[in-house]
């Protein structure tokens, strides 16, 4: 597998050189959270942002663009879109609030299109999904709709690579799931057209055994490209990561990484893949109403995942998770910001 950095990461790093020192100075000087959250040396943490009830609360997805951090707050909106709205908060690197955006429904997916620098905001992971694309520079936005999902649920997360955008098909209606688990998305007027690239019952190679297995993806959730260019999907309730090499191509290959701690299956949410050894991991503790900044002298080469109450280091060869920051309530969204 090739080892390359995405265009978005390279561009972000070049833009970051002047201000990341300020970010780390603020993070290092901020007040740490209560004693219930602890870090295993050499890791340390501090508070980057907190909820501001009743205006915005339940922080989840995190995106970074042009020296800014965007965090989606769910505000207890219904994940099927039947009631409520979410707030997207734009922060400076020192944690100060710049502006906020309101979207109807429950926001779960939040990514920046590296080609247009527009913010893609995806709502309603259980049913009735919609997409809002926002230009943070002028606050212009446009809403897009989906046809009724073939798998019967909603859409959860997005991942960009080149000209392609992929979306995870969440909350499937059937067990076994024979419908789409990952789709390729195309904007068409005010509509999002989707084409399946992975079905819920596809075959895969289990990385821990080398044997072929048939998947039954019951909870497609968070999704991200790793540093090698592979698309990595978290099937949360199934306690496994699904790795797609050459996603959407005729030579696409699929791998399964079963997740565990002490031989017990573990469900995770987001996963980040530090492509350089120095940086900071932002992680949102949704029900703890806090976004933490986690630092270490060196990161890597392993990724890090949001486990039920901790931030864990993940061995992709074995699927074993090892806590490095513990005592959170419910970690969800994550983002790795590299140092220049």
Regions found by a protein language model. Give the residues of each.
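N-terminal secretory signal peptides that target proteins for export/translocation
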Residues: 1-14
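Sec/Tat signal peptide C-region and signal peptidase I cleavage site
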Residues: 31-35
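Sequence/structural signature of beta-propeller domains
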Residues: 36-340
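Bacterial N-terminal signal peptides
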Residues: 17-29
């Amino acid at each position: 597998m090739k080892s390359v950095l995405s265009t978005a990461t390279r561009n972000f790093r070049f833009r970051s050189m002047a201000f990341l020192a300020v970010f780390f100075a603020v993070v290092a000087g901020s007040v740490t959270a209560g004693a219930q959250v602890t870090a295993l040396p050499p890791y340390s943490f501090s508070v980057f942002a907190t909820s501001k009830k009743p205006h915005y609360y339940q922080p989840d997805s995190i995106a970074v663009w042009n020296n800014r951090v965007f965090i989606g707050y769910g505000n207890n909106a219904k994940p099927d879109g039947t009631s409520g709205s979410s707030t997207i908060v734009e922060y400076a690197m020192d944690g100060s609030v710049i502006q906020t955006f309101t979207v109807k429904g429950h926001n779960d997916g939040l990514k920046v299109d590296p080609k247009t620098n527009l913010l893609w905001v995806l709502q309603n992971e259980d049913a009735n999904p919609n997409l809002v694309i926002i230009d943070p520079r002028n606050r212009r936005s446009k809403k897009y709709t989906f046809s009724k999902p073939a798998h019967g649920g909603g859409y959860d997360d997005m991942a960009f690579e080149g000209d392609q955008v992929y979306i995870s098909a969440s909350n499937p209606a059937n067990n076994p799931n024979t419908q789409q688990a990952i789709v390729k998305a195309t904007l068409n007027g005010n509509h999002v057209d989707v084409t399946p690239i992975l079905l819920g019952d596809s075959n895969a190679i289990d990385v821990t055994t080398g044997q072929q297995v048939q998947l039954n993806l019951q909870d497609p959730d968070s999704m991200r490209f790793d540093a090698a260019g592979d698309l990595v999907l978290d099937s949360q309730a199934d306690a496994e990561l699904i790795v797609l090499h050459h996603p959407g191509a005729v030579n696409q290959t699929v791998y399964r990484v079963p997740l565990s701690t002490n031989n017990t299956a573990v469900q995770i949410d987001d996963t980040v893949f530090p492509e350089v050894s120095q940086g900071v991991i932002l992680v949102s503790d949704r029900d703890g109403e806090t976004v933490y900044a986690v630092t270490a002298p060196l990161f890597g080469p392993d990724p890090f995942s949001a486990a039920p109450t901790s931030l864990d280091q993940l061995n992709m060869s074995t699927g074993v998770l090892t806590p490095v920051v513990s005592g959170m309530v419910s970690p969800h969204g994550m983002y790795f910001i590299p140092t220049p």
